[in-house]
Amino acid sequence: MQITEIFRSIQGESTHAGLPCIFVRLTGCNLRCVWCDTAYAFHGGTKMSVEEILASVNELSGRAVGQAFQPVQQPSSAEGQARKPVLQAISLVELTGGEPLLQPEILPLSEKLLAAGYTVLIETSGERFVGALPKAVIKIVDVKCPDSGESGTFEMKNLDAVDAKDEIKFVIASRRDYEFARDFTREHELAARVRQVIFSPVFADPEGKWPALDARSLADWILSDRLPVRLGLQLHKFIWDPAMKGV
C-alpha cells in the first residue's frame, strides 16, 4: 500500500471529535476539490505492507504487537460495584487520504485492525462504493457540494450501503453549497439513514487560495431551517497550525 503518513492526534471531525486517534493517510486521490487541505497526499508516499501498517499503528497506540488491549482496574464505586475498566491504549483508528478506497488492500487492512480490537473509521469522498467494506467499519462518507468542483461524483448506491453507525458529511463553502446540502439531506431523508449528518464549513486556506465560510453563518442557516444535522468544525485546526501536517 502507498502511505503518506501514519500519526497520532486528536480526532478533529465527526462524532468522534476530541478523542485520541491513530490516523493512516493513504496516498492518491481521483478527485481535485477546490478547497482540498491534503493535496500533499495526491502523490508519493511510502510502500508498506498491511503487516507493517498494523505494527506502526500498534506502536503509536501504545500497544505491543499481538497483545490485546489491557484494562486498568478501577476502584469500586461507593455502591460497591466495580467500575468499567479503562483501556491503556488508543483504540480509535481512522483510514483516510487521499481516497483510501482506491487501494484494494484497504479491505484486509480494515479487517486486521478490527480483529486486533480497534474501532475503525474510514473517511471517503463518496465517489467509490462503500458496500464492500467490513460491516463493523464506521463509514464517514462525503457528498461533494457545487463549490468543491466535484459535485455530481457521489455514488448514489452508497445511500443504501450506509447504516445507523455511519455518517454523511457535507463540506460547505457558500450559501449555494448549504442549499444543495440542505435539499439533498431532506430529499434522501439522510437523518433516518445514518447516525449523523454533518455540515462542516470550509476552513480558510493558510496561503489565501480560498476563504473560510463563517461558522456563525452556517449555524444560523441550520437553525433557521431546523435541520437535524450536526455543525462540524475541524477541531485540530484550532489546536495546531492549520497548515501543519501530521495532526
Name each region found by the language model.
Residues L101-V247:
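Conserved AdoMet/S-adenosylmethionine-binding subsite of the radical SAM
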Residues M1, R8, P20-C21, R32-G80, ...:
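Conserved Radical SAM active-site core
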Residues H16-G18, P71, V162:
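A generic structural micro-feature
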Residues I10-C21, G28:
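S-adenosyl-L-methionine
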Residues R25, T96, I198:
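Conserved Rossmann-like nucleotide-binding pocket used by diverse enzymes
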Residues V24, G28-L31, M244:
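Disulfide-bonded cysteine motifs in exported proteins
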Residues T27, G97, I172:
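Conserved residues at beta->alpha junctions
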Residues S14-A17, V34-D37, A243:
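Short, glycine/acidic-enriched capping/hinge loops at junctions between secondary-structure elements
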